[in-house]
Amino acid sequence: MLNTGDTIAAIATAIVPEQGSIGIVRLSGSEAVAIARRLFHSPNRQKWQSHRLLYGYIRHPQSQAIIDEALLLLMLAPRSFTREDVVEFHCHGGIMPVQQVLQLCLENGARLAQAGEFSLRAFLNGRIDLTQAESVVDLVGARSPQAAQFALAGLQGKLAQPIRHLRATCLDILAEIEARIDFEEDLPPLDHAAVLHSIEQVFCQVNLILATAERGELLRSGLKVAIVGRPNVGKSSLLNAWSRSDRAIVTDLPGTTRDIVESQLVVAGIPVQVLDTAGIRSASDRVEQIGVERSRQTARSADLVLLTVSAESGWTQEDEEIYRSVSDRRLILVINKIDLANPETVIYPAEIKRVVKLSAAQNQGIEDLEKSLINAVQNQELQAANLDLAINQRQAAALTRAKIALQQVKKTIDQNLPFDFWSIDLRTAIQSLGEITGEEVTESVLDRIFSRFCIGK
């Protein structure tokens, strides 16, 4: 574990050469204000007050050379993110100003912060719990408005509150059980039915929250979608129509697309990486052969395959062969060019359940494609959850452990086993729920969580 008694410093804003207008250097710790007083000089002798901006210059303490014109923000403990004294130098952006100011801070008593160390201190000092800390990372890395919305909900405690309530319920049940173990003769008999009812209520709530795990994974990682098919079925036209751009070259010549063309979209709040692939066919051209092989590899690694065929030519033997090679993937059949031919004449395998008929050239049917895509990746359990939550993999794993433990408690009660057996599994559930908020967590878990943060957070 890091030494939390040190005063730490880091650049808190992204460094963008010649573009960033503002750069922030952040300090946190008992020496933060003292370091700031050595470096910052206000021409009008302004009073140093918490949560007030001061205007002035950052000077080298020995040479008195001006390093930058800046604003200083003090946030004195405990009214700061870390609940320590926090100082921010708001400098000019770019590379040199913030790096020079950071170096001065380090030369005057601060230590360079490690990844996530500001947020770690906020957690250790009780300012935030683990779910809120993880939500900070999610908010910074959000790739869609919906992802940002769920991250903000987590930051506001929307996950921590129900988890704490469930854990408190389990603790109350455990207290009743252990009281019967220690003072059985002095207390009335335990109502088994009431205990079982409470356990089942907790179990149902755990299941509801677990149902948001798939949503969370989609919002954080996004969806990789591969457009595959034989040449000249309109794959590149589909990419262009969907992305509302001319990312891919479109011609009537087979084999025009020879490499993977990518576009980033957001569909119903989910980040989607759309990959237009080379037409799959037997090719004599070496370059085209490489493109075809890349198409097959992309299809195998995609979360969802859009198998694209032409309404003009119908379902061909080539389409059948391509379908058989990707039939084990999550798949949508896209019948393109419906402006040129009747799509009802396309006879495709009956086992294909998700079919979208569109015209990429006429920009028809794109909304239907997006609806089908969302239906393909979101199961009914997720849609039914309807919670303002999107848990991550760590939280889902802990909830799964709690769920298994609660199942075992129910089984133990049904089998009328001694109270000692009830308490063992109930303690496991309590510990697993505590791991989510950080009430019960190991140092190695903390290291793993906060190592994902950028320096300065």
Curated annotation (Swiss-Prot):
Record-linked InterPro entries: G_TrmE, GTP-bd, GTP-bd_TrmE_N, GTPase_MnmE, MnmE_dom2, MnmE_helical, P-loop_NTPase, Small_GTP-bd
Limits of the TrmE-type G domain: 222-378
First-tier enzyme category under EC: hydrolase
GO terms for biological process, alphabetical: tRNA methylation; tRNA wobble uridine modification
Entry's cofactor comment: Binds 1 potassium ion per subunit.
UniProt main location, coarse: cytoplasm
Keywords: Cytoplasm, GTP-binding, Hydrolase, Magnesium, Metal-binding, Nucleotide-binding, Potassium, tRNA processing
S-S pairs: none
A single MF term (Gene Ontology): GTP binding
Residues holding K(+): 232, 251, 253, 256
PROSITE patterns on file: G_TRME
Binding site for GTP: 232-237, 251-257, 276-279
Sites where the protein binds Mg(2+): 236, 257
GO CC, alphabetical: cytosol
Cofactor field: K(+)
Localisation: Cytoplasm
EC nos: 3.6.-.-
Binding site for (6S)-5-formyl-5,6,7,8-tetrahydrofolate: 26, 88, 127, 457
Job description of the protein: Exhibits a very high intrinsic GTPase hydrolysis rate. Involved in the addition of a carboxymethylaminomethyl (cmnm) group at the wobble position (U34) of certain tRNAs, forming tRNA-cmnm(5)s(2)U34.
Subunit structure comment from the entry: Homodimer. Heterotetramer of two MnmE and two MnmG subunits.
Family: Belongs to the TRAFAC class TrmE-Era-EngA-EngB-Septin-like GTPase superfamily. TrmE GTPase family.
HAMAP family named in the record: GTPase_MnmE (MF_00379)
The protein's name in its UniProt record: tRNA modification GTPase MnmE
Species in which this protein is naturally found: Microcystis aeruginosa (strain NIES-843 / IAM M-2473)
